């Protein structure tokens, strides 16, 4: 199965 898409989380 394809890897889960990486969603970058903005860090303030």
UniProtKB/Swiss-Prot annotation:
* Secreted listed as a keyword: yes
- Name of protein: 26 kDa cell wall protein
Q: Where in the cell is it found?
A: Secreted, Cell wall
Tagged with keyword Secreted: yes
Q: Please tell me the species this chain comes from.
A: Nicotiana tabacum
Give me the Gene Ontology terms describing cellular component.
extracellular region
Keywords in alphabetical order: Cell wall, Secreted
């Amino acid at each position: 199965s394809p890897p889960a898409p990486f969603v970058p989380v903005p860090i303030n």
